[in-house]
A protein has these predicted regions:
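Domain-scale recognition of functional cores that engage charged ligands
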Residues: 5-220
Length: 221
């Protein structure tokens, strides 16, 4: 994503977060991948989803910095897909008289982009079975968590997620919910009705208290 929310012009991953080192978010994550690759004796790839606005700049940043020690084949940068935009009345927004305005399809589109970009096929070819997913603006994320991965594998899960308890009802974080179909998913805080945001269970705790921190494991298949 773009770094506008951080007051930074350019890809969010280029934002410097090291108070002394000045390392960028991209460098922090790349060095973690390199460290764990050496620790476990494997070639662990770093996959980065970009948008049209920052794809080329992201590629150039990694290239100009020697991919922070990672081999070229272990840095896979792919663009997310674009979808038509609509206004509040559900009507298509035009970019020009003959073209529809489009926007990136968001975090959820990462799974589709992994497929359409050929990244999933590359992972299958390399025997990679588990995908560790996190947001670029989380420098503290434990990208390789043995306990989390072990639990995911033991349960033979398709998806595993980490959650944190909400600090207060209005905290701006998506929450895990169980839909009427029985499926579990994440509802953004902006989409959760106010009465459900403040709803309490029989113990007096928030009914929707499990906040999503966008750390997931996916089984490749």
């Amino acid at each position: 994503g773009q770094g506008s929310r951080l007051g930074y012009e350019g890809p969010k991953g280029k934002f410097p977060v090291g108070p002394v080192s000045g390392k960028s978010l991209f460098q922090v994550h790349a060095e973690k991948v390199l460290k764990y690759s050496r620790k476990y004796g494997v070639d662990m790839p770093l996959l980065i989803m970009t948008s049209r606005a920052n794809h080329e700049e992201t590629e150039a940043f990694f290239r100009d910095n020697g991919r922070f020690g990672l081999a070229p084949e272990n840095v896979l940068i792919f663009p997310q897909n674009m979808i038509p935009s609509i206004d509040t009345k559900g009507k298509l927004i035009l970019e020009t008289k003959s073209s529809v305005f489009k926007n990136p399809d968001g975090h959820g589109g990462s799974l589709t982009a992994l497929f359409t970009s050929g990244a999933l096929a590359e992972m299958k070819k390399r025997g990679i079975e588990t995908i560790s997913y996190f947001q670029v603006d989380n420098p503290l994320v434990k990208i390789v968590d043995p306990a989390f991965i072990g639990f995911h594998v033991l349960r033979n899960a398709d998806v595993s997620s980490k959650a944190v308890k909400k600090a207060y009802p209005e905290e701006k974080v998506g929450v895990f919910v169980r839909f009427s179909s029985g499926a579990i998913g994440v509802v953004e805080y902006s989409d959760l009705p106010e009465e459900k945001t403040r709803s309490l269970d029989e113990k007096g705790e928030l009914s929707y208290s499990s906040g999503s921190i966008a750390i997931h494991l996916f089984r490749r298949e």
